[in-house]
């Protein structure tokens, strides 16, 4: 057991709700407002400098035994996941934690995997729109939301993504018994404890 990592593996209050005895993730769709209200609350706090966010995460990753990148600032237009995998000797090119920011300096989301994006709706009419996407694992088309939660929340707040950079932390040597989703959860909770505002506040828990 990694005691330092375990300290940050917990579910933030209100991340889930219960209905008919079952637990569900909070939504950004329909008449669900928990995540939007939380985003609005977070947007009322002062931003934290990118350099400080980097410092917090690098210190934490080193403490749990993950030696990561010296400078995690990447140009999103030039991302090559296979190259990152080879350079940092990752077991899987999805072994990444990444963070994107809004133009006014807020952390938009803490995420994992090889899917950095700056998705955002063009209008509120698109919030609840769905489309069919091919799943290469099931080899079937699946109906899914057109836009992701962080994009919807950022659009609702009247903000825009900063597409000039993204933070990417390659996760080499993930502690035994844990997976990249655990590191994502821990990093999100760490930043919350450090009072770093996160607009898509619950996303790292899903």
Feature names for model-found ranges:
Residues 110-112:
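Short linear recognition/processing motifs and adjacent strand/loop elements at protein termini
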């Amino acid at each position: 057991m990694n005691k330092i990592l375990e300290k940050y593996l917990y579910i933030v209050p209100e991340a889930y709700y219960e209905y008919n005895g079952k637990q569900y993730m909070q939504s950004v769709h329909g008449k669900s407002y928990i995540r939007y209200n939380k985003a609005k609350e977070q947007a009322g706090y002062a931003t934290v400098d990118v350099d400080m966010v980097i410092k917090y995460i690098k210190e934490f990753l080193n403490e749990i035994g993950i030696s990561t990148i010296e400078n995690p600032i990447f140009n999103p237009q030039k991302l090559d996941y296979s190259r990152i995998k080879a350079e940092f000797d990752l077991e899987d090119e999805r072994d990444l934690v990444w963070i994107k920011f809004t133009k006014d300096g807020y952390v938009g989301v803490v995420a994992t995997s090889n899917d950095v994006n700056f998705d955002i709706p063009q209008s509120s009419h698109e919030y609840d729109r769905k489309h069919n996407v091919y799943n290469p694992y099931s080899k079937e088309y699946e109906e899914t939301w057109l836009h992701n939660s962080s994009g919807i929340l950022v659009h609702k707040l009247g903000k825009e993504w900063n597409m000039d950079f993204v933070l990417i932390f390659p996760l080499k040597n993930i502690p035994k018994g844990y997976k990249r989703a655990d590191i994502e959860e821990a990093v999100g909770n760490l930043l919350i404890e450090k009072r770093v505002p996160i607009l898509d506040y619950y996303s790292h828990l899903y």
